[in-house]
């Protein structure tokens, strides 16, 4: 098995979660409720946490929102959820933290955008107040720079210097450098203001895949801070998923990235939890972490003119996800389970043998039977109208036997070993 080389960084503690170096890449999400509605926000955080989000960011943009943060924390604690809350501050964060000190205490991390804290001396004072508040409350800070809200005074200074140079760079290259400089200079200021280096996480978000890869490669080479990855706006549907996967997979494979968020634009009627599931699937398909049993299924072809195997694959995936809230506690290691649902004799038996448990359904013109393979061996053949029910029962029994208290696969974790550079 290959060993993935991760950047060696400071390790940042955010409540019970460790971020950086050999620590697992952490999945983050963000609510879209009105934070002033404490009940709705707490319930959505619960939903995101149930889906697998390990930290959740909430908007703190008004006195009404700030006044409810402590209540949101209490509601989550009462429900048994220790999910760390990240306060997303823009424009007026210092005022809200000053007026509502319990807000700052209830949060586990502050997100500060240097581009919209303020200009000149006044902006420096606002930034300083927020950093000192974080230090006093022993909270972590993500200094998050965005392409769309870059500090314009810094950008102008760097553009002017570029024009005056003997070999000026294209403006877009200067803008990328300004993103990095903004993050690094802000982190340096934060340390001088008393925030320890192991309380700082950086991000430099843009919307284009190649730009994100370039910026993070450079940022990662110039600091030892953990990095939060994500496109500023990935977009809707398959475009958003593909863009996020393309960008983050390259960086993660190079050992860059310690927390991730998939910033999908929700489609009408789609669950907010989709961004969490996509993040999990990126990490799991790369072999970096395991969250839920994965289903391998063939794409179908002229040999599989029926939809039986597709329906069974979907049923199995849904069943596994629904069971994980219980299985995660009862059967440690079950998240590494691999199930194959194949549609014909061409690759069906082979893929089924390679999975922990697999079924090869008959293709067009094949004998209407479905052999089931367990740990590489053919164990039983199913046929008739109850194949789905019978196969799920076999999966259930396999999980109990192999991941139960005395199971041989209990606590096993099939992930790529991690080393720090």
Curated annotation (Swiss-Prot):
Pathway: Isoprenoid biosynthesis; isopentenyl diphosphate biosynthesis via DXP pathway; isopentenyl diphosphate from 1-deoxy-D-xylulose 5-phosphate: step 5/6
Disulfide bonds: none
Keywords from the named record: 4Fe-4S, Iron, Iron-sulfur, Isoprene biosynthesis, Metal-binding, Oxidoreductase
EC number of this enzyme: 1.17.7.3
Pfam families (alphabetical): GcpE
Signal peptide: none
GO MF term set: 4 iron, 4 sulfur cluster binding; 4-hydroxy-3-methylbut-2-en-1-yl diphosphate synthase activity (ferredoxin); 4-hydroxy-3-methylbut-2-enyl-diphosphate synthase activity (flavodoxin); iron ion binding
Cofactor(s) listed in the protein's UniProt record: [4Fe-4S] cluster
Function: Converts 2C-methyl-D-erythritol 2,4-cyclodiphosphate (ME-2,4cPP) into 1-hydroxy-2-methyl-2-(E)-butenyl 4-diphosphate.
UniProt-recorded name of the protein: 4-hydroxy-3-methylbut-2-en-1-yl diphosphate synthase (flavodoxin)
Organism: Neisseria meningitidis serogroup C / serotype 2a (strain ATCC 700532 / DSM 15464 / FAM18)
């Amino acid at each position: 098995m290959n060993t993935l080389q991760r950047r060696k960084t400071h390790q940042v503690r955010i409540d019970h979660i460790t971020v950086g170096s050999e620590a697992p890449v952490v999945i983050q999400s963000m609510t879209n409720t009105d934070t002033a509605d404490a009940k709705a926000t707490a319930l959505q955080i619960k939903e995101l946490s149930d889906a697998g989000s390990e930290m959740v960011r909430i908007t703190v943009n008004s006195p009404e929102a700030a006044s409810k943060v402590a209540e949101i924390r209490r509601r989550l604690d009462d429900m048994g959820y220790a999910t760390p809350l990240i306060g997303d501050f823009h424009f007026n964060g210092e005022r809200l933290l000053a007026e509502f000190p319990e807000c700052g205490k209830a949060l586990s991390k502050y997100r500060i955008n240097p581009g919209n804290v303020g200009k000149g001396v006044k902006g420096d004072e606002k930034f300083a107040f927020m950093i000192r508040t974080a230090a006093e409350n022993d909270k972590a800070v993500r200094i998050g720079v965005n392409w769309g809200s870059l500090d314009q005074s810094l950008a102008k200074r760097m553009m002017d210097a570029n024009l005056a140079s003997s070999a000026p760079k294209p403006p877009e290259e200067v803008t990328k450098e300004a993103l990095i400089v903004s993050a690094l200079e802000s982190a340096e200021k934060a340390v001088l203001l008393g925030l320890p280096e192991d309380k700082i996480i950086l991000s430099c978000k843009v919307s284009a895949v190649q730009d994100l890869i370039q910026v993070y490669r450079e940022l990662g080479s110039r600091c030892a801070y953990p990095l939060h990855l994500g496109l500023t706006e990935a977009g809707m549907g398959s475009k958003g998923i593909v863009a996020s996967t393309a960008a983050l997979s390259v960086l993660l494979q190079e050992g860059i990235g310690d927390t991730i968020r998939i910033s999908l634009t929700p489609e009408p009627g789609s669950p907010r939890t989709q961004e969490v599931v996509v993040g999990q699937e990126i990490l799991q398909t790369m072999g970096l972490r395991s969250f839920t049993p994965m289903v391998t299924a063939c794409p179908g072809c002229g040999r599989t003119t029926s939809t039986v195997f597709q329906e069974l694959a979907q049923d199995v995936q849904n069943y596994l996800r629904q069971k994980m809230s219980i299985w995660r506690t009862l059967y440690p290691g079950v998240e590494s389970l691999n199930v194959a649902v194949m549609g014909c004799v061409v690759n069906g038996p082979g893929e089924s043998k390679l999975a922990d448990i697999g079924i090869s359904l008959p293709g067009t013109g094949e004998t209407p039977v479905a052999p089931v393979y367990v740990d590489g061996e053919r164990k039983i053949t199913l046929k008739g109208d109850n194949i789905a029910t019978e196969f799920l029962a076999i999966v259930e029994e396999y999980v109990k036997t192999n991941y139960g208290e005395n199971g041989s696969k209990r606590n096993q974790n099939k992930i790529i070993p991690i080393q720090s550079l």
